[in-house]
């Protein structure tokens, strides 16, 4: 059984996407971390994850993502975001 299938089976709320194209990738400082925001082709929701250092831009690349759906409140408005736990180039 693959790592992804094991993760999905163990964590019921976890979702996975294969070979999706990255339309936009933004990296910005947030405390001691780099906050990465990725927009994917065919999705209107931002996918976010943290890293300790900056990485090469993923814009135009195909990636595999494992993520949780969550909602954040910004200025009193609930916004849907995806919290990425695993991202890999496909």
What do the predicted segments below correspond to?
Residues 29-44:
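Short, basic/aromatic beta-hairpin or loop at an interaction surface
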Residues 41, 55-57, 75:
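Amphipathic alpha-helical interaction segments
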Residues 2-32, 86-90:
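Structural detector for short beta-strands of small beta-barrel domains
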Residues 68-90:
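OB-fold/S1-family single-stranded nucleic acid-binding modules
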């Amino acid at each position: 059984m693959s790592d992804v299938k094991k993760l999905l089976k163990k964590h019921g709320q976890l979702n996975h996407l294969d070979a999706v194209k990255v339309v936009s990738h933004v990296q910005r400082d947030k405390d001691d971390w780099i906050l990465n925001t990725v927009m994917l082709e065919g999705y209107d929701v931002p996918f976010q994850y943290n890293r300790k250092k900056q990485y090469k831009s993923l814009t135009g690349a195909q990636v595999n993502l494992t993520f949780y759906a969550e909602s954040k409140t910004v200025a009193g408005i609930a916004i849907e975001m995806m919290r990425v736990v695993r991202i890999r180039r496909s």
